[in-house]
Amino acid sequence: MNKLLRKVRKAFSLKADNKAETGIGTLIVFIAMVLVAAVAATVLVHTAGTLQQKATSTGSQTTQQVSTGIQVNSIYGLDSNKSVPTHGVIEWLAIQISITAGSSPINLANVTISLTYHGVSASLTYVGLENIGNATVTNDVYGFNSAVGGTNNVFNSSYFKTINGASNGSKHFAILVLSDPTNSMTAQYPVISYEDQVDLLVNVSAVFGGITEGQAVSGEVQAPVGSPGVIQFTAPESFVSDVIQLQ
């Protein structure tokens, strides 16, 4: 009887089936692992691509910020009343600038001149378009002039016309183009490129009431990106001519 029971149990044993089920389960787990790995790989590839694009963009922006810049070549001032020995007050400034080697072109309409004098700070922007008309007649004038053909007087009053009053003069600067080999600068788009030379004209009489003898001035000519041009000078103790080199 016992032998018969053993034979029946052996005939209907589930060991083989258990092994089959175990094999199928292992296969399912393996397939799931492969799918998870594939999804993870896809996510990694996508993330790597995104990071690469961001790194490239950041690198380009950083390169632009590092290479772009303005340099101040010289600064001259005008004391228009030199006939009075005790006058000694600079009324107008001509800040000659160019852009640094390798710099991207810079739109001067987006540039700011910051100046500090006697503890007072001012921020000046391009005067741009000024409407000087009346109810019936309109004249549109830009604070933009060209002396590419040459000039013997950068302090010609016509160059300062748009900033001659206290309203514009205390808040804005004008542009005088000295060199523009590509003939690309315009009043609407005063974009300075390499080899261009420009004077930024400032009415310091309107901004600070003038700059007196022996006084220090500091500031910057700053574009939206890149290194600024540095303004740092002390006016001479005595003005012996109407035009004075300050920096």
Swiss-Prot record:
Glycoprotein recorded as keyword: yes
Gene Ontology CC, one term: archaeal-type flagellum
UniProt GO molecular function: structural molecule activity
Post-translational modification as stated in the protein's UniProt record: Glycosylated.
GO biological process, one term: archaeal or bacterial-type flagellum-dependent cell motility
Sorted UniProt keywords: Archaeal flagellum, Glycoprotein
Location relative to the cell: Archaeal flagellum
KW Mitochondrion (keyword) present: no
Residue ranges annotated as propeptide in the record: 1-20
Domain of life assignment: Archaea
NCBIfam families to which the protein is assigned, alphabetical: arch_flag_Nterm, PRK08541.1
Remaining remarks: Flagellar filament preparations contain one major band with molecular weight of 41 kDa and several minor higher molecular weight bands; this is the protein sequence of the major band.
Family under the similarity heading: Belongs to the archaeal flagellin family.
Function: Flagellin is the subunit protein which polymerizes to form the filaments of archaeal flagella.
Protein name, per record: Flagellin B1
Lineage of source species: Archaea, Methanobacteriati, Thermoplasmatota, Thermoplasmata, Thermoplasmatales
